[in-house]
Amino acid sequence: MDMAKNDDKKQLKCSFCGKKQDQVKRLVAGPGVYICDECIELCSEIITDELEEDINTDMSSLPKPSEIKSYLDDYVIGQDDAKKALSVAVYNHYKRINLNNVNDDVELQKSNILLLGPTGSGKTLLAQTMAKFLNVPFAIADATTLTEAGYVGEDVENILLKLIQNADYDIEKAERGIIYIDEIDKIARKSENPSITRDVSGEGVQQSLLKILEGTIASVPPQGGRKHPHQEFIQLNTTNILFICGGAFDGVDKLIERRTRNSSLGFGADIKSKRDENVGELLKKIMPEDLLKFGLIPEFIGRLPITVTLSALDRDALVEILTEPKNALVKQYKKLFEMDNVHLEFKEEALKAIAEEAIRRSTGARGLRSIIEEIMKDIMFEIPSDESISKVIINEETVSNKNPELIEAEGGKRPPIKIKKPRAKKGNETA
């Protein structure tokens, strides 16, 4: 009897449920504690349930594609197809991040985005506005400044440093950010066939970008510049960073046209002149083989599976850009003049003339501000000193001769500017 009692005392048992070793399949030992396989399974189920609850909460707070597009509509004029495609791609990207945080049989692959469109069509603005809406860190990099490691220029890791800096060095936040790489078409290799000489700013940069686009733990020098062995590095996982690469890809339309023309020869083929199909329409037909012929390497094309094309902006779209968005240029200049107690008016004909000048210069929306600055420079210089001006009218002639119509104030002097002084807080007042 005493022997049986001693055996019971010696037998190990689970510290959580109290079951003895012979009552369970396995007992795992720790420093002074034991846990059985049944308790391990129960703990695993609890953790999984809590993770799924967190994911459901994250999914409910994730804006839907229609909400993303609606926000983009407030700031970016036109490009409806591009905004829809971008909204869906970004929504799916953040869904993927949330899903991959739980144990699941299906692993969603990363989907970076390639934006193609003429200069000034809104590529950078779309990416900036998207990041602002999602409230995630955002960084812009210029592909033309990048070179292969070991050569004069920027390493690709410097792109990641910009994102870390914009996230105030919060690594976890940076790892869910968005990076926009502009002028990506400028790192196309110089010829379709691999060159004997080293292409350090073309194919070499594409090779350097492959790992961070796919997802890797990158070593980022905290002070930027070149890496050296005696400095500490910031470790950044790029798996959940969304990369959007943009470029004008001048000349790729000719490659698309040649391919589509060759594939539609023969009886019954549609005969179209160049005038019938603009560059924007041709870009919508782009295929990986066109990008390959342009100079992107196959591995790089594979890391950018989603292609979004933007069309060149016509005159009406440019006029809308001048007036419609929340931060429209016309609204900005009116506000500047209002701060001097001067009313600024743009005639419809003037807006059309400004838009036509931007088209003539082939600068798109990007060139609108410089055109307006040229028109307004002299009058903005005079207004603070000349108190007789109460209203400035910009008409069609002003766009060419830079002489706006000026309206004098009643009595020859406009009212003084009223500046509201901030009221002192009661807590700051002294007796």
Swiss-Prot record:
Chain positions covered by the region annotation Disordered: 405-431
Q: Where is the ClpX-type ZB domain?
A: 2-55
Determine if Zinc is one of this entry's keywords. yes
Q: GO molecular function: any one?
A: ATP binding
Q: Name one GO cellular component term.
A: HslUV protease complex
Where composition is biased (Basic residues), the residues are: 415-425
Q: Which Gene3D superfamilies match?
A: 1.10.8.60, ClpX chaperone, C4-type zinc finger domain (6.20.220.10), P-loop containing nucleotide triphosphate hydrolases (3.40.50.300)
Tell me the superkingdom of the source: Bacteria
Where does this protein hold ATP? 118-125
State where Zn(2+) binds: 14, 17, 36, 39
Tell me which InterPro entries the record gives: AAA+_ATPase, ATP-dep_Clp_protease_ClpX, ATPase_AAA_core, Clp_ATPase_C, Clp_protease_ATP-bd_su_ClpX, ClpX_bact, P-loop_NTPase, Znf_CppX_C4
* Record-annotated disulphide pairs: none
What PROSITE patterns does the annotation carry?
CLPX_ZB
* Biological processes annotated in GO: cell division; proteolysis involved in protein catabolic process
**Mind listing the UniProt keywords for this protein, alphabetically?**
ATP-binding, Chaperone, Metal-binding, Nucleotide-binding, Zinc
Report the function annotation for this chain: ATP-dependent specificity component of the Clp protease. It directs the protease to specific substrates. Can perform chaperone functions in the absence of ClpP.
Self-association or partners: how does it assemble? Answer: Component of the ClpX-ClpP complex. Forms a hexameric ring that, in the presence of ATP, binds to fourteen ClpP subunits assembled into a disk-like structure with a central cavity, resembling the structure of eukaryotic proteasomes.
User: NCBIfam families this protein is in?
Assistant: clpX, PRK05342.1
Similarity comment: Belongs to the ClpX chaperone family.
Protein name per the record:
ATP-dependent Clp protease ATP-binding subunit ClpX
Please name the source species: Clostridium tetani (strain Massachusetts / E88)
The gene for this chain is clpX
